[in-house]
Amino acid sequence: ADAIVVHKGRLRLLPPSVYAKLAIVVHLSASTKYAADPTFKYQVAEVEDCLRRGADAVSVHVNIGSLTEDRQLQSMAAVADACERAGLPLLAMVYPRGPGIKDHPELNTLLHAASLAVDLGADIVKLPLHGPVTAMKRVIDSCPIPVLAAGGAQVSDHQFGAFVADVM
């Protein structure tokens, strides 16, 4: 591993050796499955505080298509501005989730999510894995910042290796 993603409270629990071996990405967003709207991601930490605590980068989570998309986008834009001032990279985890979104988002939705992350100031975007290799390749090729893929169907180790080889 090159980095770990943790919430701010976990920073104090990390042994000093972790800071020497891995990049620390502090996740600023949180919610629970018990919330009235579990797709709403609340900002629970500040960029400046994370920098003081030793973060190498921060991340935010935005659910596009959710009923609270507007507030999540405003929060992400403000975090991007704070990251620029602090000199910290921003990882945007942008997931299509909400009333009008299918379980497996369409290619155009993922292209929009990647573009939105770029437009709002992210340095890296994490998107849900979708469809065939050619679809994800199109998303990756269209995006001027690095794209991380999250999730995907459960497959054998061999199938996963073949998929990774195809994407690379």
What are these regions (language model features)?
Residues 1-5, 9-149, 154-168:
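Alpha/beta enzyme core
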